[in-house]
């Protein structure tokens, strides 16, 4: 599949676009922004619960920056596609904690589904180790 960086977004003309991974972009406009994932990339990379948080527009699944972008970021970090941010602002562990607090506040249904999914994965891993 050929991916293309967006020039336009649901929030306006894209003035900055950073590729998070093929088909997934962090975009900024003059006044807003978010995460844009091409539909086929979103279906491959994001859980159904995460996909339900985003909204479709222009061939992308979109997650606005204030409340919903953290869903896409958490999914990409959980799968190891992107690393948690560490820099002069975020020390190790702080970025993930910030993302998790945002999810718990703005997307509690997604947070609960994620926690349940992680519990099931941990139980399966434990069972495999015991064999």
Spans of model-derived segments:
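Sparse, context-dependent recognition of short Cys/His-centered cofactor- or disulfide-binding micro-motifs
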Residues: 10, 20-22, 57, 88-91
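Extended aliphatic helical segments
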Residues: 14-15, 24-27, 53, 71, ...
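A short, exposed loop/beta-hairpin motif centered on an aromatic-Gly-Thr core
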Residues: 55-65
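Short, compact, well-ordered microdomains
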Residues: 64-121
């Amino acid at each position: 599949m050929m991916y293309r960086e967006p020039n336009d977004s649901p929030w306006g003309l894209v003035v900055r676009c950073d590729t998070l991974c093929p088909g997934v972009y962090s975009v900024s406009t003059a006044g807003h922004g978010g995460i844009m994932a091409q539909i086929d990339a979103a279906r491959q990379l994001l859980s159904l619960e995460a996909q339900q948080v985003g909204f479709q527009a222009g061939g992308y699944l979109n997650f606005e920056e204030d409340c919903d972008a953290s869903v896409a970021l958490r999914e990409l970090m959980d799968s190891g596609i992107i690393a948690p941010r560490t820099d002069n602002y975020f020390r190790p562990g702080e970025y993930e904690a910030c993302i998790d607090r945002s999810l718990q506040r703005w997307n509690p249904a997604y947070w609960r589904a994620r926690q349940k999914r992680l519990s099931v994965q941990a139980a399966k891993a434990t069972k495999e180790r015991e064999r």
